[in-house]
Every structure is written in C-alpha cells, then in structure tokens.
C-alpha cells in the first residue's frame, strides 16, 4: 500500500489533507513531531512525505537533509505559502520532489493530490529501473 506521511504543525491543515488522501485510497499517517516522522521513514511505512514549514524545534530546511539521510528514495513535497524563491532553490538542491502552496480551495488541494500521485508514479519507475 502507498504510504503517505503528513508532517505539519497546523492541525486543521493536517486533518484536511489526511481526509482527502484517505478518500483517495492512500495509507496516511499524520504527525507534528519530528521524532514520529523519522520513525515512520525508518520503518519504511512512508514513501512520500507532505512537509509543512515548521514543527517542534526544526524548520523544513533543517529536517529535509535528515529525512533524506534516512531514506534517499523518499519523495518530499514541501507545502508552504511564504517561502522565498532562493529558499526553494536550496531545498530543491537538498532533495525535495515538489513545492506546493498551502491549499486554500479545491483547486489547490487538487494540485497537491496530483503531486502526490506523480511522486508515487516516479517512485514506481525508479524501483522498476533498479531491478
């Protein structure tokens, strides 16, 4: 089953996204804890991560390299509204798969849904190529 981890401090946002992805058939885990996020990645229950910008004591720029050290094949989708272009470029270099604006309406949620679908398809292609 396709495991999706949603890591965000915003409870309302986490719940909205979790509901949307559960309805779409994904196995969803939600957390606002860095420790829980790392645990899910190390246990390989999540292949794709929707990452907010801040949680616990770390921000996304500090957490992304840690997540990638745990699983190089992990697809990370950064969900942030107020991130500068320079920071996005840096985070892309760190290994994010996609950057999406925080959803405010149905169109925005559809964009994130498509990004997650694309991330899973990309992972399947990479796994097939490795065989």
What are these regions (language model features)?
Residues 30-48, 52-55:
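Acidic, metal-coordinating helix/loop segments flanking the phosphotransfer/catalytic sites
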Residues 62, 82-101, 110:
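Alpha4 helix (beta4-alpha4-beta5 surface) of REC/receiver domains from two-component response regulators
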Residues 111, 118-131:
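CheY-like receiver
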